[in-house]
């Protein structure tokens, strides 16, 4: 083998090694320590005695943890309901969101009092175009109005239970994975719910920095 061939072979080997390292670093994900996720920090809460008997239920286990934690920290059922609703907007985007509407039925158990209904579900447009159909007054205002009348905890504090789920991330469950597979073609490929060319899967961690910023603005400036 002459010197030219040796040099050529050496260059090819170096290029191959460099490409291999680049491929490794580009395809190897930075692993997230799931024990540090906010949802796991609040999972093992202990009842403080602020409320002797209570129950929180929702479509999402993480949102339910948020509601439990709010009550454990001294909030009432309305506070927990608002926290759960906002947590669902983070963890259940296929069914919940800040642009939606809704209705809430509240009852505090006082003698002679009838349940109260808060409705915030009128739509801004009946001619649907992607992104232009939102609730008026909508979810955010509806939650705020309900909390003003029925809540106990400082509303800004409630947001602090939810924002870390968007900012630091949450673990995808099987239901979200299934929904994303069905509706993935309608989602922007640059969204946090895509990893490369495929939607995220159960066990992946999703961070939503823009949503976290929006929640902070609502917390600090109001609806």
Where are the model-predicted features located?
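Activation on terminal intrinsically disordered regulatory regions flanking enzyme cores
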Residues: 15-18, 32-34
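Surface-exposed charged/polar residues within alpha-helices that form helix-capping/stabilizing sites
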Residues: 68-69
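Noncatalytic scaffold domains of N-terminal-nucleophile
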Residues: 24-65, 77-223
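N-terminal Sec-pathway targeting helices
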Residues: 1-15, 22
